[in-house]
C-alpha cells in the first residue's frame, strides 16, 4: 500500500492580526491571508504581540543579552568548553558561557543590552572573561544582541485553555529551550487524546499579572546595578 501524510507548512513574517471562532473552526488572520484550524496553540511566549490576545497581560517582560567575540584560536581557546557544552554560573545575576561553531566565545546575562552603551557591554564582558579565562588575554568583542523573556511572579510557567481547541503557554522565565520542548510534546499529546494527565501542570486561570510594567523596570534596574558593580569590581 501507499501511505501519505500531510506535511506542515511554515509561514514566516506573517504576524497574526486576529483570532476568531468561525463555526467549529478557528480563523487565524494575517495581512496576507487566513488559515482555518480545528486547534490552535499560541506558543510565542514573550514575543506574543498584537491586540488580538490578552496573553501579554499574564507575564512581565525581561531581557537577556549576549556578547560574542571574534573567532578564537590557540591552546587557551581550545580549553574552553571543548565538547561544545553550555555553562552558567550561580551568581545573583547569572552569566552564561558557550562557544559557537566559528570558535567565538559567547557571554550572556540578564538585562537589556540594547539600552546599554557598547563600551559598557565590552567592559562587562572583559570582566567575566578575565575572571574565568585569564589565559586568553585581551579579547575583541564583535557582536551583541538581546532577547526577551516572559517572567511570572512565582517563576512558574502558565498553561491556558481559554476556549475549546485553543491552548496557550507563557512564562518560561528563561528556561524555554528545555521546558518548551516538554510542553510542545505534552500539548500534542493532549490535543490528540484530550487527557489532561498528559500535561506537566494543570491549566491556570486567566489572571493578569499586577503591576507588570513596574516589575519589569525593577528587574532591569537590579540587573543593571549588578552589572555596574561587576564592571567596577565591587562584585563579581
Language-model segments: residues:
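Short, small-residue-biased leader/transition segments that mark boundaries at the very start
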Residues: 1-7
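Residue-level signal for beta-strand positions within conserved beta-sheet cores that form or flank
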Residues: 3, 12, 24, 103, ...
Amino acid at each position: 500500500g501507499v501511505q501519505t501524510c500531510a506535511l506542515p507548512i511554515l509561514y514566516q513574517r506573517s504576524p497574526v492580526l486576529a483570532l476568531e471562532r468561525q463555526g467549529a473552526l478557528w480563523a487565524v488572520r494575517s495581512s496576507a491571508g487566513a488559515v482555518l484550524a480545528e486547534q490552535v496553540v499560541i506558543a510565542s511566549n514573550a514575543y506574543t504581540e498584537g491586540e488580538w490576545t490578552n496573553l501579554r497581560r499574564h507575564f512581565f517582560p525581561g531581557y537577556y543579552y549576549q556578547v560574542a567575540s571574534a573567532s578564537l584560536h590557540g591552546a587557551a581557546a581550545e580549553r574552553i568548553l571543548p565538547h561544545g557544552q553550555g555553562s552558567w554560573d550561580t551568581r545573583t545575576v547569572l552569566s552564561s558561557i558557550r562557544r559557537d561553531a566559528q570558535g567565538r566565545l559567547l557571554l550572556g546575562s540578564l538585562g537589556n543590552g540594547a539600552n546599554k552603551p557598547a563600551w559598557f557591554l565590552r567592559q562587562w564582558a572583559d570582566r567575566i572573561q578575565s575572571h574565568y579565562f585569564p589565559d586568553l588575554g585581551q579579547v575583541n568583542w564583535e557582536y551583541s544582541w538581546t532577547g526577551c523573556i516572559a517572567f511570572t511572579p512565582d517563576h512558574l510557567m502558565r498553561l491556558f485553555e481559554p476556549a475549546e481547541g485553543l491552548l496557550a503557554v507563557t512564562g518560561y522565565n528563561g528556561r524555554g529551550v528545555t521546558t518548551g520542548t516538554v510542553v510542545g510534546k505534552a500539548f500534542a499529546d493532549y490535543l490528540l487524546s484530550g487527557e489532561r494527565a498528559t500535561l506537566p501542570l494543570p491549566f491556570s486561570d486567566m489572571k493578569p499579572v499586577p503591576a507588570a510594567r513596574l516589575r519589569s523596570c525593577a528587574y532591569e534596574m537590579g540587573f543593571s546595578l549588578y552589572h555596574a558593580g561587576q564592571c567596577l569590581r565591587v562584585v563579581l
